[in-house]
Amino acid sequence: MKEIEYVKELSYRAKKASRTLKSLSSFQKNKVLLELANLLEKRKSEILSANEFDLKNGKEKNLPSALMDRLLLNEKRIDSMAFAVREIVSLPDPVGEVTRGLTLPNGLELVTKRVPLGVVMVIYESRPNVTIDVGALSFKSGNACILRGGSEAFHSNEILVKLFHEILNKEGIDTSAITFVDKTDRSFMLPFLQQTPSIDVVVPRGGEGLIKFISEHSMIPVVKHDKGVCNLYIDQDADPAKVIPIVINSKVQRPGVCNATENLILHNGYPFRKELLEALAKEGVELLLDPSALSLYPKGRPVKEEDYQEEFLDLRLSVKTVSSLEEALTFIERTSSGHTEAIITEDLNAAKMFTNSLDSAALFVNCSTRFHDGAEFGLGAEVGISTGKLHVRGPMGLVHLTTTTTYVTGNGQIRN
């Protein structure tokens, strides 16, 4: 009973705040966000102290290295958070945008405009920057948000929401516009998923277990940020000068994120497979190899079939050798999570066949899978990267946090 009362109260307050946000001008919203960006830079020491507490707890609990990397904040990452907020400020406000306008033969005037979704709940793990990204995107698009982060990042998330609340209080705006769930017990999660009167959409960001639980139990529409089993295919006509830099960047730059490559597919006609595997090993990547690749690099480990559907989020990579593009496409269709697929090739027909045949949120030609990101796509930041097809696919930015309302003005017309 205690859980239900707590959840209903927080949800009700967020819904109430969402109504007041509709009346804020773009100027008012941008002013708040610019102050937030400045405050993030001014209060770095407080943020880092809170994050250090979470990191210490994480080490004591022996959290995986990939999760610890996502949990880590430093001065550079805080600067990146502030930069992302300013990018959001620079973007057009989607609220009020006219998407359709016409006068019907009977004289009725129709105008369709973008309006906020209402209340967005985001349930996420590890990454404190999500608190700022989601808070800023929701606020700019006129939505209240309910933030339920993981227990491992509790203190980091708490201080970031506190900074947001300081500015909202200063500007006379209801702080429930950015609602922080300060209960990390999972018993509080299920009641939130039943708050259909107050919450309009739930966005889960986290491990496969979290996504599955929310998808199965939510009575509220869910936009899934599912796992990223990203495939990168090296065609027989790939340019060797492009291959190693792209593959290394796709896997090594930040292995603990959803747009890092997990499966490397090698055409057996590509002549520099051995050199590529050696380059990956030199970067500290653990290679899980099929028999063909293992014969080129015996220091690797034999791959298991289930490895090809695993999101490692670590310096670990599964390798598959194929004899044709068609075989590569069949493999991708079987293993992909629908997140990101990429091809490296100089053959335009191969590139066209690749992009026309696959069904994922993003398909890349001759570039790193790491580019599948809201900021890189010019969205400022993202609520998540949706692997579903409704209501958004790919990075979920400002415009995707809106729906539409049609306003009809008449002069006494009735329908025959």
Swiss-Prot record:
MF terms (GO), sorted A to Z: glutamate-5-semialdehyde dehydrogenase activity; NADP binding
Enzyme Commission (EC) number: 1.2.1.41
Pathway: Amino-acid biosynthesis; L-proline biosynthesis; L-glutamate 5-semialdehyde from L-glutamate: step 2/2
GO biological process, one term: L-proline biosynthetic process
EC primary class: oxidoreductase
Subcellular location: Cytoplasm
GO cellular component, one term: cytoplasm
Catalysed reactions, semicolon-separated: L-glutamate 5-semialdehyde + phosphate + NADP(+) = L-glutamyl 5-phosphate + NADPH + H(+)
Keywords: Amino-acid biosynthesis, Cytoplasm, NADP, Oxidoreductase, Proline biosynthesis
Highest taxon above the source species: Bacteria
N-terminal signal peptide: none
Similarity comment: family membership: Belongs to the gamma-glutamyl phosphate reductase family.
PANTHER family: DELTA-1-PYRROLINE-5-CARBOXYLATE SYNTHASE, GLUTAMATE SEMIALDEHYDE DEHYDROGENASE
Record function comment: Catalyzes the NADPH-dependent reduction of L-glutamate 5-phosphate into L-glutamate 5-semialdehyde and phosphate. The product spontaneously undergoes cyclization to form 1-pyrroline-5-carboxylate.
Family annotation (HAMAP family): ProA
Protein name: Gamma-glutamyl phosphate reductase
Gene (UniProt): proA
